[in-house]
C-alpha cells in the first residue's frame, strides 16, 4: 500500500492548549456567575412568612390588646345607677409628663429619641382608644403635662405645647380641661417660676377655676401656687379664688381636683390594695417639689370647698384615703384618690386613668343638718392601660427570632433544607401530575432524593454567605419597618 499521497493533518499543540484554556475560562465564568447569583439570592418566600408573623404580632399588641383593655373598663361593667339613668362620664388623666431632653440627661441622644417615640406613641394610642371606645363626656388632666416645662424658654415651650396637643388632641363636642399645673410645669411653692406660671395660664387657662358638669361642681385648685409664702404675685390668684368660692353659693356636689395630694398621716391613712408600692405614702420635699400640701393649707381647702370627693396626681401611684374636716360643728369626711400616672415611664408597671361616673338628678334632695346628700352621686373606677413593657418584650423576642431564623437559613443551609425546606415543600407544593412531583421509588438512593430537594423553590443555597445573610436581613428589616411606622403614626 502506498501512503505517500495521503494527506496528514497535524494538530497543533498550541491551538489545543488555547482551546482548553478558553473552555476552562468559559466554565469558570459560568461557575462564578452562578455563584454570584447564589450569593445575591433573596428568599422572598421566607421573608414574606416572617413579615406576616410580624404583622400579626404588632397588630395584636397595638390593637387587640388595647381594645381588650378598653372593654374591661366599659362603663356598663361597673356603673350601678338606676335603670335608664343618664350619667355624666369623666376621664381623669394624671402626670402624662411627656418626655423631653430634661427627662434623661445622661443617656445618648439616639436612645432618648427612640424612647420618646415609644412613650409618645403609648400616650397617643391610649388617648385615641379611650376617646373612641369609652367616649367620656369630660376629660380632666391633673397636672405635670410636661417634664421640664418650668425650665424651657418660650421657643422650646411652644414647640412642646404643640407636640402635647398633637398627642392629646381635643375631641369635638367633648370637654377637655388641661389648665391644672404640676410642679414639672411651673415649680412648687416658694420656688414657683413666675414666668412659667404666667405662660402656662396664658395657653391653658386660669390655673384655679370651677365649672359645672353632670350636675356637679368641679373645683380646680392650683395648690402649688397657693403654697408659695414668699411671692404674693404667685399665691394671690389661688388665694382669692379660694376665698371667693367659700363665700359663694354652690348647691351642687363639689369635686376637688389638685395636682399635689393633701396632707395625711401615712401610718394611719394607708393607701389600699390597688397601690403598687408596698411602702407608706412618702412625705418628702425638695427642690421644686413636695409630696403633700401642708397640713394647715389642706384643712383650709377642705373646709372652704367641702368636697364630696377629691382627686390628685403627682405621686404616680394609686392611693385612696379618707380626710376629715370640721363643718358646722360636726365632722365631715371626703375621699381622696391619688390617680395613677397614665405614662409608661413614671416608675410604675401598670399605667392607668381614673374613670368617674356622675348621676345627680334634679330631684335629689340634701340633708340640711349634715350638709350631705341623700344618696351617693358619684362612682369611680380604676382603668388600667395596656401593659407597655410586655409589648416591648414581645417585639424584642420577635427580633431575636427573626435574626436567628435568617442566620439558620444562611449559616446552616443543609440542615435548613433537610428540616424547614422539606416541610415547606411538602405542605405548599401541589402535585400537578408530573412524575417529578410523585413520590420517589424506594430503590432510588437518598442522595438522589436530596438532589431533587435542591431544585425545590423552598430550598436555599447550600453555601454559607455572610453577604447574602446581610442582604436578606436588611430586606426583612426594611419590610417590617412600615408596619411599625403605620401603627406608630397613622393608627
From Swiss-Prot:
Biological process (GO), any one: GPI anchor biosynthetic process
Binding site for a divalent metal cation 2: 144, 183
EC code(s) of this entry: 3.1.-.-
Needed cofactors: a divalent metal cation
Membrane topology field: Multi-pass membrane protein
Entry keyword annotation includes Hydrolase: yes
Residues given in the record as a divalent metal cation 1 binding sites: 95, 144, 323
InterPro entries in alphabetical order: Calcineurin-like_PHP_ApaH (IPR004843), Metallo-depent_PP-like (IPR029052), MPP_Cdc1 (IPR041834), PGAP5/Cdc1/Ted1 (IPR033308)
Miscellaneous section: Present with 583 molecules/cell in log phase SD medium.
Protein name: Cell division control protein 1
